[in-house]
């Protein structure tokens, strides 16, 4: 079944501007600016006023309508990023060998360096994405805080760190060591 026209309306909060040129969305807010290229998705954008955007799909089937809702969510994530930012907290889990995590600079690029994982000599390094800041928590032992404006960059960095600390060739029910995401949220907490 084809839907002749399907609309989604996205409200823009105060202090945020959204510019759309040739399906490249640029969102500017108090925390900075984010850009997302949506040229591969066949949707139409109309600014109702400066406070709302109408996203439309013409003659779309179920997959196109689902893509419409995806586009709305992506832009909503950009708006949240430039207003509140995103923060992931990661905890180090180990039974015997304490995991040693440092943030290092190498060739002008920042890396997270993971040592002594399961007592291994191998040093694991994860590149920190652009626009993402990492710090080792001063209040909580064995905690890494990943924060930034782009949800994609922050969550991908957290996933990269969690993935590089996977236990291989052992029973994962017994060997629970690793670095796991313990908390997700925004930098600016809602009251």
From Swiss-Prot:
This is Large ribosomal subunit protein uL6. InterPro entries: Ribosomal_uL6-like, Ribosomal_uL6-like_a/b-dom_sf, Ribosomal_uL6_a/b-dom, Ribosomal_uL6_CS2. The keyword DNA damage does not apply. GO terms for molecular function: rRNA binding; structural constituent of ribosome. Its main location: cytoplasm. PROSITE patterns: RIBOSOMAL_L6_2. GO terms for cellular component: cytosolic large ribosomal subunit. It is found in: Cytoplasm. It comes from the Eukaryota. Pfam families: Ribosomal_L6. Component of the large ribosomal subunit. Mature ribosomes consist of a small (40S) and a large (60S) subunit. The 40S subunit contains about 32 different proteins and 1 molecule of RNA (18S). The 60S subunit contains 45 different proteins and 3 molecules of RNA (25S, 5.8S and 5S). Keywords: Cytoplasm, Ribonucleoprotein, Ribosomal protein. Belongs to the universal ribosomal protein uL6 family. Component of the ribosome, a large ribonucleoprotein complex responsible for the synthesis of proteins in the cell. The small ribosomal subunit (SSU) binds messenger RNAs (mRNAs) and translates the encoded message by selecting cognate aminoacyl-transfer RNA (tRNA) molecules. The large subunit (LSU) contains the ribosomal catalytic site termed the peptidyl transferase center (PTC), which catalyzes the formation of peptide bonds, thereby polymerizing the amino acids delivered by tRNAs into a polypeptide chain. GO terms for biological process: cytoplasmic translation.
């Amino acid at each position: 079944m084809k839907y002749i026209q399907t609309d989604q309306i996205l409200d823009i909060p105060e202090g945020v501007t959204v510019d759309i040129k040739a399906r490249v969305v640029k969102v500017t807010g108090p925390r900075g600016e984010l850009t997302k290229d949506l040229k591969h998705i066949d949707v139409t954008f109309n600014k109702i006023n400066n406070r709302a955007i109408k996203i439309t799909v013409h003659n779309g089937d179920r997959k196109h309508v689902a893509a419409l809702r995806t586009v709305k969510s992506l832009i909503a994530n950009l708006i949240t990023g430039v207003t509140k930012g995103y923060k992931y907290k990661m905890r180090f889990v180990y039974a015997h060998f304490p995991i040693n995590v440092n943030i290092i600079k190498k060739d002008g690029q920042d890396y997270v360096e993971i040592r002594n994982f399961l007592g291994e000599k191998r040093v694991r390094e994860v590149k920190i994405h652009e626009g993402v800041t990492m710090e080792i928590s001063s209040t909580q032992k064995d905690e890494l805080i990943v924060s930034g404006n782009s949800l994609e960059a922050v969550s991908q960095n957290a996933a990269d760190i969690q993935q590089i600390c996977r236990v291989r060739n052992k029973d994962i029910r017994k060997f629970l060591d690793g670095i796991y995401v313990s908390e997700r949220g925004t930098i600016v907490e809602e009251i």
